[in-house]
């Protein structure tokens, strides 16, 4: 299978490249190589490559920056997937588009499944939902894959907190928001198997537990035997410009039907911690 991978400089893309079997032909394209917001460039680049599938990992993901840079957020997160969908259809390729839990408003008391109605509350969430809608509208051979709170694969908030705790300083995690902490490698390992099913549609690939970042750091404290405390943070105490859903946890009903559900959080955290050593 020939795969074209957009957003190749990102964490998910780098992780996916590390797990795809060598007999597949993968063409990674960074933003410098392919600006998905440029329709003509997308067509000129993708169609001659004759891909079997396009995996879109290119996005503007800085939630607060999206509030300040709305035009760029919609260009990257809505128009970009639109252009990719048109190009994928033109060359007969499937399109796997990675989206987010932030398409939901957080008012549900239990995890969101694939049939729940999105209602985003931030520019980031609205722009990502727009991208989903463009993909569904313009190419029938599509996968929309929503993920949870991604960690691992490189420097991120969680790895910085763990480094702080290992140095003897207390960690700090947001307490009044919950989601689905999701190890990036566990998602990356399931993208190609999902593509190969050709069972197109919308899927949730997210960790199975509902936790806050405070809960996650507390688990890490015990798993790693760290003799430090974890401090609770509240949204109101942080300089966050974009609203966050109170609950953005996902449940993976359709992925479970395919045997692609993710491992428990403790398994993910042990793998994550092993990679930090």
Map each language-model feature to its residues:
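Catalytic helix-loop patch of NAD(P)-dependent Rossmann-fold dehydrogenases
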Residues: 75, 79-83, 103-145, 150
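Mid/C-terminal beta-alpha module of Rossmann-like enzyme folds, strongest
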Residues: 15, 190-191, 197-241, 273, ...
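Glycine-rich Rossmann NAD(P)(H)-binding loop
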Residues: 173-178, 203-210, 257
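NAD(P)H-binding glycine-rich loop region in Rossmannoid oxidoreductase-like domains
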Residues: 39-76, 89
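C-terminal amphipathic/interface module of NAD(P)-dependent oxidoreductases
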Residues: 243-277
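Adenosine-cofactor binding site in Rossmann-like domains, unifying the SAM/SAH pocket
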Residues: 23-44
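NAD(P)-dependent short-chain dehydrogenase/reductase
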Residues: 133-179, 185-186
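N-terminal Rossmann NAD(P)H-binding glycine-rich loop of SDR-like oxidoreductase domains
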Residues: 1-22
